[in-house]
Amino acid sequence: MVVHPNEKQFCQLILTKPTVENVATIGQYQLTQPRLKGINLLEQSDLPILYGGGRDFMFGELNSELEQAEHATTNSPPQMILSDLFVLNTCVLIWFQDWERSLQIPYRNIMYHAIRKIDDRHLTEGHRLELMIAIERDPIINELFPLPNVSKANNFTGTGSYLQETTLSSVELILRPKYANFDRHYNVEVEDLFTFKEFGLNRGDTMVKNCHNAILTCMDFYPEEEPTNQQCTQPHSTTTEISAMPDIGHLQNVYVNSGTADDLDGDSTMDIYAQDGFDASMALQFYADQPLAGQKHRV
């Protein structure tokens, strides 16, 4: 599940479900593993790190105008699948409970994600938000969410070719919590991954916000791809401006020093670099009731 951040990937269907045995929560990782400076987080942990997620999401595709008209005509609600969401540092996993399979979504394939307010006045407090994720289409996504039928689109809008062109690139998926913030619900199995200690109240609208923030954090691990030619020209101008700046020794009120601020030389030495009438000095203040040396205590 660990991949190089610059590799191009596609969505996959896998049989792996994250558990306490094959993933580590972010809180557990921070307590047990030291942070190594200068080393990518993806290379520091042998196990994928769980940043967020939750149980009992209703997963499906955001209905287009055509699909909404079809559902209204046939009086059939849109198909939703009961699933669990896992936001890992390597990818986003959506576990389908009935299929016992996971949809693995690379972060580079996520075009945008947002919190969407459900347009239903009958919903209770704490159950009015859903998570929306727009991802690029690939063979797996096209198999799970086929493109709209062009013939039906022609009958509905008269512009089927345009509709097909605008829906080729991405698909918008929604994850709606099954339960509200304070609904009384007991899990079939004991929850040992999304515990209250690690993720707090992880249900309803709060769970949607937690998942959105977790995806936002993990997407920072995967920066944008190489810039275009227009963007590449900008660093050259910056480099030219930096090279045109005068030498640091010619600036006023600047002293050349390669030490640790404990080797300031006298005026006779510094006059070689700057003759502007200013003297170098350092002010230190010590308190009588505080020792200069102490001990570190781990809390």
From Swiss-Prot:
The keyword Nucleus applies. The keyword Cytoplasm applies. It is found in: Cytoplasm; Nucleus. GO terms for cellular component: cytoplasm; nucleus. Its main location: cytoplasm. Disulfide bonds: none annotated. Keywords: Cytoplasm, Nucleus. Belongs to the LOT5 family. This is Protein LOT5. The gene is LOT5.
